[in-house]
C-alpha cells in the first residue's frame, strides 16, 4: 500500500509538486 507521503505520486518521488 502506498504511503500517505507518496500518495499521489506514481513516480515514486516525494510530494512537492507534481509536474504540470
UniProtKB/Swiss-Prot annotation:
Highest taxon in the source lineage? Eukaryota
- Map out region (Disordered) in residue numbers: 1-20
User: Mind telling me what this protein is named?
Assistant: Bulb protein
Protein species of origin: Narcissus pseudonarcissus (Daffodil)
Organism placement in taxonomy: Eukaryota, Viridiplantae, Streptophyta, Embryophyta, Tracheophyta
Amino acid at each position: 500500500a502506498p504511503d500517505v507521503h507518496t500518495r499521489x505520486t506514481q513516480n515514486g518521488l516525494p510530494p512537492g509538486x507534481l509536474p504540470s
